[in-house]
Amino acid sequence: YELHRQIPLLLHRFAKQNLRHKYKEENLFFLGQIGRRIHSAGRTMAVVAILLTISLATMFVGLTMGAGYKANMKAYYPYDAGVAIDAPLEKSSMDSIVSFTEEHCGVEDSVSYYLYAVPEKSIEALSLSDYNHLREILGLSPVVMGNNEFLVHCDTWNYMDGIRQGLKQQPEITLDGRTLTIAVTPILTEPMEQYQMAGTKGYVLVLPDEAASQLVGEKIRLAMKLEDGGYPELKSDLKQFLNSGKWQPELQSGQQLPEKVTMGVTVRAWGVANSLTGFTAISFCGLYLSIIFIILSCS
């Protein structure tokens, strides 16, 4: 309040200090009128200024938070549709899911792939070919890597420093008697949804196909690119299909189901439709409050 109360007084005082400007034509009369107005209605002017400031601030917050909420959807839902099953199933088990999806909307591209368990490491792995197929679905350029190299993909920034430090301390890894060194570009960061689809911890190890094939595919994933992006109800349709007797998954030879099998389905159209509600609510609240404060300032 004091800030808005004193600013007009300071501006008036500075204007009066310029004597040439003060005594020029009718300026003396106007400066006197302004000074009397400031002293008689200074408090009202300060309150109006505060209300206008609050209204502009709420309008800015509403627009920026709403727009940011909408922009983050691309990172949360990079794939048109995805199915994540934490079980060592055969890749052929995912074919019926693709066929079911094609009955409801066109499937332009799809890839079934494993998240491999890395011995004695708290990180999962992707094969380079599957990784590049995911990049192709997302419209990203493929990655070229040597047969004795590896890289880490991490789209979660709070893990970046720890990964960089870990790669400096251990620039090589040994898998089944084979030593791999870090690639020229050791860390890639494009949004790939690394808490479910391309990893479950916010990061994943990318290995040459030959090295990855020696590991156990503990979790299976399916990513799909759909015509026109699909539709919101596809999420519930896929869940219903997975829980029905129509889907008959097959275990990998020599593998067993874990005690608890986690399944997840993501559909971008569903996420966008639901995020639109949040986006509209946040923006509307900010704009509504700003209008209220503008009305108060004018009354």
Locate the predicted segments by residue.
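Hydrophobic alpha-helical transmembrane segments in integral membrane proteins
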Residues: 58-79
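Helix-boundary and loop/linker segments of multi-pass membrane transporters
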Residues: 22, 35-38, 272
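Hydrophobic alpha-helical transmembrane segments of multi-pass inner-membrane transport and secretion
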Residues: 1, 40-65, 272-299
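Hydrophobic alpha-helical segments
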Residues: 1-15
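Nucleotide-cofactor and metal-assisted catalytic machinery
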Residues: 72-277
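Membrane-embedded translocation segments of transport machinery
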Residues: 36, 54, 63, 84-87, ...
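Membrane-interfacial segments
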Residues: 11, 15, 19, 66-73
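Juxtamembrane inter-helical linkers in multi-pass membrane proteins
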Residues: 14-33
